[in-house]
């Protein structure tokens, strides 16, 4: 399994934006589409401290949060070191 996991739904524009940033960074990730999959959505929520919105992004076991959080890390210069660790 890749060290980056992103929980998504097929129609979520924020999910697409987060995946685009990760692709731009040249990293591979595991995408778990929770569309119509309540068991996977519950597992995502449990792993994301109760958050139910998508995307939910994990780098290794660190919960990064959603799309805005990912872009905030990038703007702050903290995403590349996190991806390289």
Region spans (language model):
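Local sequence-structure signature of Cys/Sec-based thiol-disulfide redox active-site neighborhoods
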Residues: 1-28
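Short, glycine/charged-enriched secondary-structure capping and boundary segments
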Residues: 20-22, 45, 71-73
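Structural micro-motif
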Residues: 49-58, 68
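Thioredoxin-like thiol-disulfide oxidoreductase module
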Residues: 34-52, 78-85
């Amino acid at each position: 399994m890749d060290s980056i996991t992103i929980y998504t739904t097929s129609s979520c524009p924020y999910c697409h934006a987060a995946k685009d940033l990760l692709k731009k960074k040249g990293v591979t990730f595991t995408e778990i589409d929770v569309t119509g999959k309540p068991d996977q959505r519950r597992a995502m929520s449990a792993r994301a401290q109760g958050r139910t919105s998508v995307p939910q992004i994990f780098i290794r076991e660190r919960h990064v949060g959603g799309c805005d959080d990912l872009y905030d890390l990038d703007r702050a210069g903290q995403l590349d070191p996190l991806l390289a660790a």
